[in-house]
Amino acid sequence: MAKDDVIQMQGEVIENLPNATFRVKLENGHVVLGHISGKMRMHYIRILPGDKVTVELTPYDLSRARIVFRAK
């Protein structure tokens, strides 16, 4: 999949789930299932409920997202 096919949005983590998965509430009100990107796993970046994150959504499945950045 090409990089320009993704949709980037801002959101807030509302719940931790098993296997590095999180429930994220987007700024438009939708709730999606998000998993941590590979680079964030490699650098041991911790994500807690309440953190503001940037997620990437694919146009094919808008209910799942990849967490690519955690704001301070």
Curated annotation (Swiss-Prot):
Similarity annotation: Belongs to the IF-1 family.
Subunit record text: Component of the 30S ribosomal translation pre-initiation complex which assembles on the 30S ribosome in the order IF-2 and IF-3, IF-1 and N-formylmethionyl-tRNA(fMet); mRNA recruitment can occur at any time during PIC assembly.
KW RNA-binding (keyword) present: yes
NCBIfam families xref list: infA
Major location category of this protein: cytoplasm
Domain S1-like: 1-72
Annotated function: One of the essential components for the initiation of protein synthesis. Stabilizes the binding of IF-2 and IF-3 on the 30S subunit to which N-formylmethionyl-tRNA(fMet) subsequently binds. Helps modulate mRNA selection, yielding the 30S pre-initiation complex (PIC). Upon addition of the 50S ribosomal subunit IF-1, IF-2 and IF-3 are released leaving the mature 70S translation initiation complex.
Places the protein is found: Cytoplasm
Designated name of the protein: Translation initiation factor IF-1
Lineage: Bacteria, Pseudomonadati, Pseudomonadota, Betaproteobacteria, Burkholderiales
GO cellular component: cytosol
GO molecular function, one term: rRNA binding
Keyword rRNA-binding listed: yes
Keywords in alphabetical order: Cytoplasm, Initiation factor, Protein biosynthesis, RNA-binding, rRNA-binding
Annotated signal sequence range: none
